[in-house]
Amino acid sequence: MASFIWVQLKKTSEVDLAKPLVKFIQQTYPSGGEEQAQYCRAAEELSKLRRSALGRPLDKHEGALETLLRYYDQICSIEPKFPFSENQICLTFTWKDAFDKGSLFGGSVKLALASLGYEKSCVLFNCAALASQIAAEQNLDNDEGLKTAAKQYQFASGAFLHIKDTVLSALSREPTVDISPDTVGTLSLIMLAQAQEVFFLKATRDKMKDAIIAKLANQAADYFGDAFKQCQYKDTLPKEVFPTLAAKQCIMQANAEYHQSILAKQQKKFGEEIARLQHAAELIKNVASRYDEYVNVKDFSDKINRALTAAKKDNDFIYHDRVPDLKDLDPIGKATLVKPTPVNVPVSQKFTDLFEKMVPVSVQQSLAVFSQRKADLVNRSIAQMREATTLANGVLASLNLPAAIEDVSGDTVPQSILTKSTSVVEQGGIQTVDQLIKELPELLQRNREILEESLRLLDEEEATDNDLRAKFKDRWQRTPSNDLYKPLRAEGAKFRAVLDKAVQADGQVKERYQSHRDTIALLCKPEPELNAAIPSANPAKTMQGSEVVSVLKSLLSNLDEIKKERESLENDLKSVNFDMTSKFLTALAQDGVINEEALSVTELDRIYGGLTSKVQESLKKQEGLLKNIQVSHQEFSKMKQSNNEANLREEVLKNLATAYDNFVELVANLKEGTKFYNELTEILVRFQNKCSDIVFARKTERDELLKDLQQSIAREPSAPSIPPPAYQSSPAAGHAAAPPTPAPRTMPPAKPQPPARPPPPVLPANRVPPASAAAAPAGVGTASAAPPQTPGSAPPPQAQGPPYPTYPGYPGYCQMPMPMGYNPYAYGQYNMPYPPVYHQSPGQAPYPGPQQPTYPFPQPPQQSYYPQQ
């Protein structure tokens, strides 16, 4: 019986999975948390699992297959949880073609891609290949071996079929030949046919009914025939696959005919029995004559011949039944008991997800967008309240409130101004503002340098990629850096725009500070100096107990209450904390997609609805209070004495109140700017790391591709075939010499065999050949037969003598063999130690002289300097 076909495993290069995954985890999850530490440990375990599954030779055992399947399940599990792409987590996987053996001057074909889908396809190929090897190793003489073989062949068939359906969508370019859809489709058919063959062997071993066995064998023959047709025009599979499939198709068909003949005998159809046995004998004879190198069918052939001889004998002497033609026989039925095992993750029965608690990337992205929506809502509400408070402070400062109703004496500093002065001094005064403004350019420059360095890395790698693409043209098959870096460049442009806006904001802050610097400096002075700087005015004691002053104090008190409520509201808005992970995971499980916008808007309205309503109520209350304050202040102004000193004093007090408000706002803005630049530095450092990582990955990919191109170029012939010399096609040679086969670039070209030597001319007895004539070199290695001669070119009989004439002083001297294949066209460049001459010996016909250069002497076969491939 023919042997089973198994598939060689693909080989891969080592890849450090842990480093890029750990870096992503550290950037994504809070530092120092248990979650981050757990995921970092899982990344290390994943890297170890890859080395265990792919970094060592695997035994042909189900335990080794289980390790491969665990790694396959794990990379399928992490695919939706990490952003694997060339411009995010960039991992380049390099795999060699399983069927390409390479050459002496170049390794086997390999492909390097930054694609987890490519890694999945190659790992699944190895799972299928190892399953085929395990099945081929089984002992088919027991039920356990038959069961395991059938199971593994069906799994291998399903795995190859899965690769066929998914490989093109998983890769960004053409795959290597071994995982191309045509090749894996053929392998799937082969594995399915062998699984059916195992069921046929099981039925035969269990001595099931011949009708069932015939149907199983006929179906197996069909499967082998389909596989044979698929690989008929392919030269990528091992050379023994094609004849083995052809032999197995015939053997299975012969088995079907044999068991159907037994059924015909049982039904008293003796002529049909003989016809089927004859067909089976012809099939097996064909196998024995053409594929005996791959299969042994002697026992089965003897079995068929014995049955055929007995059937013919019985029919000739007893039944005399007519033997029908093969085409007149009823077709044998078919019964299939096999099908490709579908690949449903997890495939391994012992799989445990190392990143079980990590949410998918789609959920992470939805959470990021939700966080941005939440931050926008909170910031918008806080900004509205702060703008309203700034507006209220501006209105009060323009009305000189509350200083106006406190300054009834006209010659002391109002208490509100003293409070503001104390606050400014406690916060550091103008020295604080000057220091904060001084730090801004340094922070800005640091961020610009990080951004420019990041973009410089991209520019340099892109320039190198463009140069190599221009040099190698279509051979440079990888994603152009210009296309790959578009998201990063867009992100860099966004950062540059942010920095430009920050510069404008810094300028506005500095301008406002310069316009209020002198007044802020006045607030920093001690109370006596401050009082001296404020003009005095006539007392207005008559207004001390007036109703309008009481109304203004009440309104100002209400306004202060609103400001305090806003501080509480701001804290409430900032402190709200809740997790949308469970809601997004539920939506993903139910619908397969996440409608982030609908879920986020609904949840934000539910949580922040009450707080945003309070913000709007606060804004409306303030609007009403400011109107009432302005009306009451008009009445207050009418009651005050109108003189120049009072007006001047009020103007100074207004400026001091305005300066305080500006000081508070400036300090807040500058601190916020400093915080902004520091946070932006962290973001830009991560951006720089991302750029550095992708550039490093691209350089690694570039080096691999350059190495492959060098090997590919080394395998190419360096020149076209050289035409043979004219004499080789001359009619005088007696036959035409075949043109030489083009040699590889690094191999010496094979020399064509010269034509037969013509008969030597008859020279006068006293004519001696010149001493400079060269003798034919001695043969190298074993002797070979002389070239065939035509009757017309056979030399006449000659007297026998020594093959090489000698000098009288050197009897019997033979020239040492050349250290290389002799080249008659370059003889003069080698200095021989003893140049031999032709010397006519007694009784020997003379050798031809140098006047016949057209016919070089026959030369021994040349030995190449390099091992033949």
Curated annotation (Swiss-Prot):
It is found in: Cytoplasm, Cytosol; Melanosome; Cytoplasm, Cytoskeleton, Microtubule organizing center, Centrosome; Secreted, Extracellular exosome. Keywords: Acetylation, Apoptosis, Cell cycle, Cell division, Cell junction, Cytoplasm, Cytoskeleton, Methylation, Phosphoprotein, Protein transport, Secreted, Tight junction, Transport. The modification Phosphothreonine is found at T479, T741. Transmembrane segments: none annotated. Residues 503-869 are annotated as: Self-association. SMART domains: BRO1 (SM01041). InterPro entries: ALIX_V_dom, BRO1_dom, BRO1_sf. Residues 176-503 are annotated as: Interaction with CHMP4A, CHMP4B and CHMP4C. GO terms for cellular component: actomyosin; bicellular tight junction; centrosome; cytosol; extracellular exosome; Flemming body; melanosome; myelin sheath. The modification Omega-N-methylarginine is found at R745. Residues 3-392 form the BRO1 domain. Self-associates. Interacts with SH3KBP1. Interacts with PDCD6 in a calcium-dependent manner. Interacts with TSG101 in a calcium-dependent manner; PDCD6IP homooligomerization may be required for TSG101-binding. Interacts with SGSM3. Directly interacts with CHMP4A, CHMP4B and CHMP4C. Directly interacts with CEP55 in a 1:2 stoechiometry; this interaction is required for PDCD6IP targeting to the midbody. May interact with PDGFRB. Interacts with SH3GL1 and SH3GL2/endophilin-1. Forms a complex with SDCBP and SDC2. Found in a complex with F-actin, TJP1/ZO-1 and PARD3. Interacts with CD2AP. This is Programmed cell death 6-interacting protein. It comes from Mus musculus. The gene is Pdcd6ip.
